[in-house]
From Swiss-Prot:
Protein species of origin: Klebsiella pneumoniae (strain 342)
Active site: C78 (cysteine persulfide intermediate)
The keyword Transferase is assigned to this record: yes
GO molecular function: sulfur carrier activity; sulfurtransferase activity
GO BP, one annotated term: tRNA wobble position uridine thiolation
Alphabetically ordered keywords of this record: Cytoplasm, Transferase, tRNA processing
Gene Ontology CC: sulfurtransferase complex
Subcellular location: Cytoplasm
Protein name: Sulfurtransferase TusD
């Protein structure tokens, strides 16, 4: 079965993103395909490379990156939601004359078209 996830909660402060990551792990362990994860609203904060959790805390931002690096799961970030919340890649930062960029490697700024494509091509879409 082919899955896609939508994450609307931040990396820290709510349970949504960590539950989504655990669900993603279970999907893959059961032999299913995880096509992509689409981060929307506050969920875009999962792509902020400037997070620095304590050494005894789970680093969810880097865990998402590992999911991409090790399993090839596409990590889409809604570009409009990201820019509103101060998450941007190098290209957008230059285009908008911002001083810096902070998009964690492995994540891609995308439009809602990526979410629509996932809805059309996956058997299940689960929102967290």
């Amino acid at each position: 079965m082919r899955f896609a996830l939508t994450v609307t909660g931040p990396a820290y402060g709510t349970q949504q993103a960590s539950s989504a990551w655990q669900f993603a792990q279970a999907v893959l362990q059961e032999g299913h395909e995880l096509a992509c994860v689409f981060f929307y609203r506050e969920g875009v904060l999962n792509a902020n490379q400037l997070t620095a959790p304590a050494s005894d805390e789970f680093d969810l931002v880097r865990a998402w990156q590992s999911l991409h690096d090790e399993q090839g799961v596409a990590l889409h970030i809604c570009v409009a939601a990201a820019l509103r919340r101060g998450v941007t890649d190098e290209r957008e930062a230059q285009q908008l004359a911002l001083a810096s960029h902070n998009l964690q490697p492995g994540f891609t700024l995308s439009g809602l078209g990526a979410l629509a494509e996932a809805a059309l091509t996956c058997d299940r879409m689960v929102q967290f």
